[in-house]
Amino acid sequence: MKTIFFFITFIVLVSSCTSNIMTKSISQVKSQFFSPALSPNVDPADEHIGHSPDDMKIIFCQQCAFHCIEKKKNIGNCENSICRCTLEDIL
């Protein structure tokens, strides 16, 4: 009876340690996957290079044109981040 008790206790301790080790290794793998380390030669400020103002105007005017087309209107004006569609319907 004592042998069975010690054997079960030993199995519980081993499984507990194994569980803790597996949890730590999985969390380390996940943290490496979601936040990869930057190489020392890369400036973090250069990671996300934004669009130039001209690019942003082109993108805005494209979105404006799509908006007007969805309303079945012609694009009237696209300046200073203001989108205006014509009153006439597209033929």
Curated annotation (Swiss-Prot):
One of its GO terms (cellular component) is extracellular region. Residues 1-19 form the signal peptide. Disulfide bonds join 61-78, 64-83, 68-85. GO terms for biological process: defense response to fungus; killing of cells of another organism. Keywords: Antimicrobial, Disulfide bond, Fungicide, Plant defense, Secreted, Signal. It is found in: Secreted. It comes from the Eukaryota. Its main location: secreted. Belongs to the DEFL family. This is Defensin-like protein 220. It comes from Arabidopsis thaliana. The lineage of its organism: Eukaryota, Viridiplantae, Streptophyta, Embryophyta, Tracheophyta.
